A protein has these predicted regions:
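Conserved catalytic or regulatory cores that recognize and/or transform ribose-phosphate-containing ligands
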Residues: 1-145
Length: 145
């Protein structure tokens, strides 16, 4: 998330850990950026557009990867606190709404479902919850083979 220290990667990491702990498969934009740019110390950056330009970071490519995962694999999208300020998270949320996927919002380190119309459902995401879940971290319920 631009404008946040380290592009808010620590919050992405914490959310991914929480959601994996609840049994979800997680597609984290932060983890994907670290894989795509392994020589970059993302956690030392200030989170500016200038840094992305210097790195030749393809925001369009990254968003394409995120949205492709959401469209093809995700059961829902988890939105970090402050997601409304992120162009990418707003796009991911809009795609989730268009596809009738569940959306979950983080409030005080807990996850709650948002209804398709944006209303607060008040249902807390718990381990073993039937539905799956991107500041968008795109999620999918883990299934045993």
């Amino acid at each position: 998330m631009r404008g946040y220290k380290a592009f808010n990667f620590p919050a992405f990491d914490k959310a991914a850990e929480q959601l994996r702990g609840l049994g979800h498969e997680v597609f984290s934009p932060a983890e994907e950026s670290c894989k795509a740019y392994p020589d970059v110390d993302w956690y030392s950056l200030e989170g500016t557009d200038e840094e992305l330009t210097k790195l030749k970071f393809g925001l369009g490519d990254a968003l394409c990867d995120d949205l492709t995962y959401i469209c093809r694999k995700a059961d829902g999208v988890a939105l970090l606190e402050g997601w409304e300020k992120s162009k990418c998270a707003r796009a991911e949320s809009a795609v989730a709404v268009s596809l009738d996927l569940n959306r979950y919002i983080q409030v005080s380190n807990k996850w709650y479902r948002i209804k398709a119309n944006g209303a607060w459902a008040g249902e807390q995401l718990e381990k073993g919850y039937v539905s799956g879940i991107t500041p968008g971290a795109a999620m999918r319920r883990a299934t045993a083979c």
